[in-house]
């Protein structure tokens, strides 16, 4: 005799008769409560654009950071639970630094994503906290430039990650994704990608778009001291954002 749905909910590793993990599905729904983020791969590099949602006028706006630096050549943005994202971002940063200290070269974007996916697959599980573990309620976009060129990976709460040309996560991801499908092409420049990302955010955000409630990072290819191809993580200034937003 089958258990009720609520009983299948109790264990993160218990499949329902239909082959579903309800706790993972709930974690994916939590992602849809987060603010919208967009990643776009272009012919000149890759960029991340994220909505910074302030819940109070008393909050210090600069304290909200939706795009984190993993390493010189990799950035990551997220949608979902902030506390969960911090755990995963910290894992990515540690993995990147350990790789640098061990091999004296920069880690690939895919390898960083894989290491975080491995943690997500465990649902934060270990022997001590096994009874309290749950899936991470966060989706992430890893963007960077390595020896293989510009890369953009989408990671969801199930631990699945996919190589993308463009991707949106968060509350308005469905509308943003449709716009990306209609407007994206492989010959995009960074400037065109930036304008596209901000135009889409302007369309899907509930608040009026301005440089205070959006954050953009660009990662362009360069070379390191030994002449090896690598990326350079750069935050787009408020002045540049205002110029592009005004032109929309």
Curated annotation (Swiss-Prot):
GO cellular component: cytoplasm; nucleus; proteasome core complex, alpha-subunit complex
UniProt keyword Membrane, yes or no: no
Keywords: Cytoplasm, Nucleus, Proteasome
Example GO BP: proteasome-mediated ubiquitin-dependent protein catabolic process
SMART domains recorded: Proteasome_A_N (SM00948)
Keyword Nucleus (UniProt): yes
Pfam families: Proteasome (PF00227), Proteasome_A_N (PF10584)
Intracellular or extracellular location(s): Cytoplasm; Nucleus
Function: The proteasome is a multicatalytic proteinase complex which is characterized by its ability to cleave peptides with Arg, Phe, Tyr, Leu, and Glu adjacent to the leaving group at neutral or slightly basic pH. The proteasome has an ATP-dependent proteolytic activity.
Assembly notes: The 26S proteasome consists of a 20S proteasome core and two 19S regulatory subunits. The 20S proteasome core is composed of 28 subunits that are arranged in four stacked rings, resulting in a barrel-shaped structure. The two end rings are each formed by seven alpha subunits, and the two central rings are each formed by seven beta subunits. The catalytic chamber with the active sites is on the inside of the barrel.
Family label: Belongs to the peptidase T1A family.
Protein name stated in the entry: Proteasome subunit alpha type-5
Species: Caenorhabditis elegans
